C-alpha cells in the first residue's frame, strides 16, 4: 500500500516570501492548525522541504 503524509501548518506564513506562501496554498494549507493528507510522492516531498520550517509532517499507513 502507498504511504500517506499527514501535514499540519504550525507556523504562520506572514513575513515569508510569496513563493513559500504559494507552496502552502498548493499543499492546501491556509490557517495555522490546518491539516491535510497527501500521497507520499517526490513532488509532495519537494514542496514540504521548501517550507519544512512551518510544518509538522507524519507518515501514516493507509
Curated annotation (Swiss-Prot):
- Tell me which GO cellular component terms the UniProt record holds: cytosolic large ribosomal subunit
Q: RNA-binding: present as a keyword of the record?
A: no
Q: Say yes or no: keyword Ribosomal protein present.
A: yes
Q: Which GO terms describe its molecular function?
A: structural constituent of ribosome
Listed A to Z, the keywords are: Ribonucleoprotein, Ribosomal protein
Q: What's an example Gene Ontology biological process for this entry?
A: translation
Q: Of which family is this protein a member?
A: Belongs to the universal ribosomal protein uL30 family.
- Report what the protein is called: Large ribosomal subunit protein uL30
